[in-house]
Amino acid sequence: MDIVRERYEIAIERIKEISTENISNEKYQEYFSKVAKFILKLNYVKDEIESGRLKKYTTEQLEQLNYELYEDIYKENYKTSLANPKFACEELGEEYGRILCYVYKKIRDLIGNVYRQEIEIVTLRIELFIELFYYFENSEELEYRSIEEAVYSFEKDNTEIFVDDMVDWRVNPKRTFAVDIVMNSDLNDIRYLYMYGEHIGANEIGMAQYLNSLSQSEIDSLAHVYTEGYRKGFVIAGKDLSIKDTVDIRYNIGFERIIKSAILDFEKMGLKPIIYPLGYGSTMCNKQYWFDHKFDEALYLDKAFVKRKLEVAKQAFENRKDLALKMAGPAVIEIFGENPFEPESKKEAYKLTKEQQKLSAGYINEYQRIVQEHIPGDQRSFTIIAFPIPEFGHNFKEMFDATVKINTLDSEKYEIIQNKIIDELDKADYVRVVGKGDNRTYINVKLHELNNPEKETNFENCLADVNIPLGEVFTSPVLKGTNGILHVSEVYLGELKYKDLEII
């Protein structure tokens, strides 16, 4: 038995005790008992996976297990869930409620790690939970500062493990968890959906069933539009795809038949698939849960943490510089048709201070610079294609078919049409955009001056390569001279719905 597994077994034995142990403060006892029992459920899943029994489950058994793992955050249960910061603070007090809610959320995040059999990360999180229990076990000596320091030290001390693992997933083709599900499962048997460990709902099941109703030639045609757009992106930009070995594939669970065909297409281009945990996913069973925990890093985000995280990220990429250099870029299948989400902003949820917002933005910028250094932008490309999901409504199938038609329009025909649009736009000094109806947009967009209009253009003719479908001409405007009002009555950005967004 290796040292990590030994630590895990010791931790699980302690969790069994905690699940039934009495502590002096009853409100904390209920919290630790509930979370400990959830950890034991994860341990049960781990055993079922390692023994091979999980693959023999019926569809009904898999559906029930998936329900048990996610039921606490379903909308109908979330109001009284300890994963809800508002309820946690009501039950445990505002001081300890928020931080214990955060700890429970991180334990819940381990579902995916368990399915991927990432025992070290699972062990670390369980050990932190046990450490915190010891503090609350002696509640007369309990100090919030001790709890906060324990969590902060844990996050900072283990940054190397977490970030190194994240980077490895993104560039290492030997991490084949999702690839194995796609390539080795019987995709006509929807039980495969439950092997990811993600929440599986009507969208994932409905999408898989609909794609299973299509012929293989129809599936191959859809996949080819996606992969050919990726290949064309390199050709049009004059970039050499032959020097690359891997492609970053991203999709929503349920699209596996298309992804399997696409992987075979990419292999013909000499590309091996990389599908990392955030590259696949399912539609959220409760977006309020996601929103409530969106800024949990406020608990520990400071200069020292950011500095350490960037050091680790840089070293992680440096250790894999050959793998990183071989990454060709992302091939993304996006989805649309989800019901609108208007979040409730809760005072109990963590929020970033202005200083932390600057630190977060600085981290993102510096991390992107590290990525750019190891996966140079002038050597990579991408493609994005989107499809509706069953949540779109009763006419989902009609919309899916219409989307396919739009995604497969004749590029040669529309290249001529879009070039004529560009020829006219290139004659302009600026473009005036005026909103229709209730839209208040009235903006002049300044264009770059062309020194040689016969050979130069301000606009990109987008023809179903990096952005699918075609039908777009775009430019980068001159900021000086661009002025007016840009108004959007309704827009979705990062899972959130914004109303009457206006920039002056």
Specify the residue positions occupied by each region the protein language model found.
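Active-site bordering "gate/hinge" segments
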Residues: 1-483, 493
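Long, well-ordered mid-to-C-terminal structural blocks that present hydrophobic/aromatic surfaces
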Residues: 478-504
